[in-house]
Design a protein with these regions (language model features):
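PLP-dependent class I/II
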Residues: 1-206
Length: 206
């Protein structure tokens, strides 16, 4: 079983190259494994959309998506694409957990999605908005804090990087930043041991 977020990962903002996607596909096929491809951010690409790995593994994959990142944050509705037999099994599991997701929310979403042009226009608008914010923020960081090393995002919602000086404790630093009404997530929160480090995850979409 392989679980991956190949597009604009949270927190690292990493996106798999085409070569790495092909390598993952080859490994899953070789061992007759199962791939869970989690894609909550894949539609938030700025220039080029990557091919889904699961598209090459129709019988050996689950492809997960969410509308909370692309439409409305409070709309906690997602979807799973898999072969028919796997979906049947998932339905039984879902019913045993909570019967079903909110019917009203699903109905509202279904009505909205009937207009594919409207939804695609919305996606393009937020892609353009996020791209402008990401590039502005990245340029500002490189100009004002050049010792903070990072890659300019190519999609998604996050910018991740770290200070050259590994002695900088970003967990302690955020306490001071909060006094100036500036907030970020110190990267030690994403590690098992929670040991302070010099890395930061920013969200540039607000």
């Amino acid at each position: 079983l392989t679980y991956l977020i190949p597009d604009f990962q949270n927190p690292s903002a990493t996106t798999y190259s085409e070569e790495k996607r092909e390598a993952v596909c080859d490994i899953v096929k070789k061992y007759d494994g199962i791939l869970i491809e989690d894609s909550p951010y894949s539609e938030l690409y700025f220039d080029k959309k990557s091919k889904y790995i699961s598209a090459s593994l129709p019988n050996n994959s689950f492809h997960l998506g969410s509308f909370s990142k692309t439409l409305v944050p409070s709309l906690r509705i997602g979807w799973i694409r898999a072969d028919e037999e796997k979906i049947k099994s998932l339905l039984i599991i879902k019913e045993s957990i909570d019967l079903h997701s909110c019917g009203l929310s699903q109905y509202i979403l279904a009505e909205y999605l009937k207009d594919e042009v409207k939804y695609e226009k919305h996606l393009q608008e937020i892609r353009d908005d996020y791209k402008a914010k990401a590039q502005f923020f990245s340029k500002a960081l490189k100009t004002i804090i050049p010792e903070f090393k990072h890659q300019t995002p190519k999609g998604g919602m996050f910018l991740y990087g770290g200070f050259e000086d590994k002695k900088i404790d970003t967990f302690a630093l955020v306490q001071e930043c909060l006094k100036k009404k500036v907030v970020y997530v110190p990267a030690n929160q994403f590690y098992i041991d929670k040991v302070p480090n010099s890395e930061i995850r920013f969200n540039y979409t607000h």
